[in-house]
Amino acid sequence: MTGRLRAPTGRYGGKTAAERQAERRRRFLDAALQLFGDAPGYRATTVAALSEAAGLSTRQFYEEFRTLEDVLAALHLEVNDWATAAVVAAVADADHLPLAERAAAIFRAYAANVTSDPRRVRITFVEIIGVSARLEEQRLARRAHWVDLVCAEANRAVARGEAARRDYRLAATGFIGSVNGLLHDWNAGWVDATLDEVVEELVRQLLGILRPAGWEPARG
C-alpha cells in the first residue's frame, strides 16, 4: 500500500467530509489506545483487528493511515501532547510559588496525567521502543522536548536567584531518564511507593541538581 485511499467528500448525515474524517480518525486512535496500550499490544495487533475494535472497515483505515506504525506514531504524539498541556497549565498556576513547591506542582501534574491511564504509560515507555528508526527518532525528539522544558524552568529559577547558574542540558537529560524509568517501574508495580512519594523523590533529585552542595543564593 503506497498511499492512503481517497475519502468521500460532501455532507452526509449532517456532517461534512472533514468532520466524518476526524470522527473516524478519533475512533481508530481510541481503539489503538486500547489494543496497543493494553492487549494484545502494538506488535500483535492487525489492521483488521484495529478496524473491528473501532467499528470501521479496513478500507476506512486506509483512508486515514498507511500503516499501523502511523497509528502508533500519532498516538504517541497525542499522549505526549496531553502531558505537555498538563505541565504547561501547572507551570502557569505555580508561577508564584517558591522553587520547591513549584517543582512539586509541575511534576505532580505530569505524573498524574501520564499515570492516570496505564495504557498511556505503555504507549509512552514500552510500545514505542524498537519499532523502527522513524519512531525512535520521534521518541528521542519528544524526550528532547521534555529536556528543553526542564532547562527552561531551570533557567527561570536561575534568573530568580533560586538556582545555581550553569548549563543544565546534560543534567536535564539524565533527569528525564530518571523520570521516565521511575514512572514506568512504579506503574508496573515494581516500586513500593505512592505516586506522591515518587514525585517527592523526583523533586529531591531536581533540587539537588539546581542547588548543589555548597551553593547559596546571591545576597541582594
Regions found by a protein language model. Give the residues of each.
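C-terminal peripheral helix-coil segments that are non-catalytic and often amphipathic
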Residues: M1-R11, A112, S116, D148, ...
